[in-house]
């Protein structure tokens, strides 16, 4: 956030809220004890269901959050960009260590689908486009 232009507190809070929703939904699709937020949060439609086969939860959540961070913080400076890439590589490698390749691929694809769904939902909230460096056009 520190290196991301336009990230005043409301903009940062919005991004962190969407990261939380994404993390919850990524796990809720594979855990019947967790209730999806679809239908509870305004206009959030049911998320993509998991297909058949095994999934690895760390790989699912890593892929979902990595996709969200890449999009939500895309306008960060060079230092932030390098940090995001490095962290994603380390976390991806750690999450997938010892997991069968087909399970990793299926899990990553599902995590990315969850992120895409949440990002599409977020695009309609009125806060996706940041003008005037994140400050209101008219300020009194």
Residue spans of the language-model regions?
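Acidic/polar surface patches and capping/hinge elements
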Residues: 1-140
């Amino acid at each position: 956030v520190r290196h991301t232009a336009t990230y005043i507190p409301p903009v940062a809070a919005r991004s962190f809220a969407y990261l939380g929703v994404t993390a919850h939904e990524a796990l809720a699709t594979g855990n019947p004890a967790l209730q999806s937020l679809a239908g509870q949060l305004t206009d959030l439609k049911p998320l993509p269901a998991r297909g058949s086969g095994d999934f690895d939860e760390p790989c699912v959540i890593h892929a979902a959050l990595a996709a969200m961070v890449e999009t939500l913080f895309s306008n960060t400076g060079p230092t932030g960009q390098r940090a995001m890439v490095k962290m994603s590589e380390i976390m991806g490698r750690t999450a997938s260590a010892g997991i069968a390749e087909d399970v990793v691929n299926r899990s990553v694809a599902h995590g990315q689908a969850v992120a895409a769904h949440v990002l599409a939902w977020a695009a309609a909230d009125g806060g996706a486009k940041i003008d005037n460096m994140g400050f209101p056009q008219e300020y009194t």
